[in-house]
Regions:
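Hydrophobic alpha-helical connector segments
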Residues: 70, 84-114, 164-168
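C-terminal peripheral helix-coil segments that are non-catalytic and often amphipathic
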Residues: 1-9, 143-155, 171-220
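Basic, helix-initiating cap at the start of DNA-binding domains
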Residues: 1-37, 44, 48
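Alpha-helical structural segments
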Residues: 20, 24-31, 35, 49, ...
């Protein structure tokens, strides 16, 4: 059955209208991701959330993955704004900063889900131009993150601080799915013999950040 188009979501004619429509689509995606895994959300489902057709959504985003990439940028920026307040004030122990970083991310499940899907889902089925725009914004955001960390760990060089953010993203991509087990995996790992198979994301991610930071500091 075709989706019904409604006048409330008319085609944007001016740049500010177009941006408003894009933000409305991102808002809808964010709401859906609070209840559904990303793989269950299609452009058609986004259209239903807004009471418009899939065609309307495609006018503003080329693919579902394009929507998620843009939402990842928006979520990451909001996190960085909050992180500047959530990290301990300098001077502080490096391990405190890493633990706060991990805890702050763990509290933002939609952001973690999107970030973990980056290489295998979000960067597929999009144009080279979309990927270029995303990666330039990602670099800008990680540079800002590196600055926040260097403010608290001044012994870290500028280059190593950016390297830390690169390793942090790769670690999140690998670790987050293990911290969201299916019911069958959760039941199996409830066995006391498999205690070490259970992943507590903020704890393990914090340890990864601390270990990586220690290695970078040791080599500098």
């Amino acid at each position: 059955m075709d989706d019904v188009e409604v006048p409330a979501f008319q085609r944007a004619r001016r740049p500010e209208q177009r941006e408003l429509r894009r933000q409305e689509i991102l808002d809808a995606a964010e709401l859906l991701l609070a209840d559904l895994p990303a793989e269950e959300i299609s452009l058609r489902e986004l259209g239903r959330q807004l009471n418009v057709s899939k065609t309307h959504v495609v006018r503003y985003f080329e693919t579902r993955e394009g929507v998620f990439l843009e939402l990842l940028n928006r979520q990451r920026l909001a996190w960085l704004d909050a992180l500047s307040e959530e990290l301990p004030e300098p001077p502080c122990e490096p391990e405190q900063a890493m633990a706060a970083w991990a805890g702050s991310l763990a509290a933002r499940q939609v952001l973690c889900q999107l970030w973990s899907l980056l290489p295998n889902v979000l960067e597929r089925n999009v144009s080279a131009e979309t990927v270029l725009v995303y990666k330039l914004i990602d670099l800008e955001h990680r540079t800002r993150l590196a600055t926040l960390i260097r403010d608290r760990v001044p012994a870290l060089t500028e280059d190593d601080a950016l390297t830390l953010t690169e390793y942090a993203v790769v670690s999140l991509v690998g670790l987050w799915p293990f911290s969201c087990p299916t019911p069958a995996i959760a039941e199996a790992t409830a066995d006391p013999r498999l205690e070490r198979a259970r992943v507590d994301f903020p704890v393990m991610y914090g340890e990864i950040l601390k270990t990586t930071l220690a290695g970078l500091l040791a080599r500098s």
